Amino acid sequence: VKNLPYSSTRVAAFLTVFLAYLFAAVPGVALAEPTAPTAGGIEIEPVAGLRAQHVAMRERLANNDFKRPLVLDSFHNSQDVRGEIYAVVPDAFGVFSEALAKPQAWCDILNLHLNTKYCRVAVAKGATSLVMNVGNKVEQPLKDSFRLVFSWNVATNTAEYQRIILSADAGPLSTHNYRITLEAIPLTTGGTFVHLSYSYGYGITGRLAMLAYFSTSGRAKVGFTVIGKNAQGATTYVDGIRGLAERNTMRYYLAIEAYLGALTLPPRVQFEKRINDWFAATERYPRQLHEVEQRDYLSMKRNENKRQ
């Protein structure tokens, strides 16, 4: 994998690749990592905090444009962006937490994304990492992609609460503090309440790259949050950096669902089930998530799977 400094050609190519993929981060001075709700200024412990979120979001979970129990929010300032999903999945908490407490599961999940070219689990001195390559939304050699290494940690895994954190200090073009966090609790109805948070920070180079991206190939791309109506009465959606965060947060959430949905099948057919289900799920939201045709996506992922 090539390293900095980047040529102008690589930077130009990167604008349409990595900015469509950016992962997760939280700088210390801007958007803080989501914390548990508070009562009287006292922080509620994680299980109670997530249960409080579930209660507070009941109306939004029951009535939303997704027509399913799912809430998507995004936040942005001059240095950071974060996307968050709260959702109810039918899987029992025990099944959910056991499946996602394995690092290989996360490589299987992340590999569903268009821009993931490679993911392998690495263990050294007791620490687990996910060694990834990201690149174009079409097939490409690994030597032309970008290497990212994420630490993977099961922070908490009990019968009442699960918290998994993926993080990386730095990425290309001054992107930094990548972070993706998954929290989950069991529900009395038998399902699982899930919170997925995805964030990253960027410096001047990254900011300029994003400005270029959003003025060219990313100009027409939008997220899911409705911000109003245009002069013709059509719905308008958030765009720019928040739209980017919302699209990728949804892609990763749908990848988790696709992974879980294949677990009951024999191992030899799970990969095909995952890639077909993930593509079908993204096509439910073509305005936001359609990028390539199904045959091209499936062919690319099958070929990429051979080199994992």
Residue spans of the language-model regions?
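N-terminal secretory signal peptides that target proteins for export/translocation
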Residues: 1-10
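Bacterial N-terminal signal peptides
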Residues: 12-26
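Sec/Tat signal peptide C-region and signal peptidase I cleavage site
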Residues: 26-32
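Terminal "cap-and-tail" regions of soluble proteins that handle hydrophobic small molecules
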Residues: 33-65, 71, 76, 169-171, ...
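Terminal, regulation- and interaction-focused segments at domain boundaries
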Residues: 72-99, 120, 240-244
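Coil-to-beta-strand transition motifs
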Residues: 80, 159-161, 175-177, 187-193
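Amphipathic alpha-helical segments
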Residues: 89-115
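Glycine-rich portal/gate segments that line the openings of hydrophobic small-molecule binding cavities
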Residues: 115-179, 201, 259, 282, ...
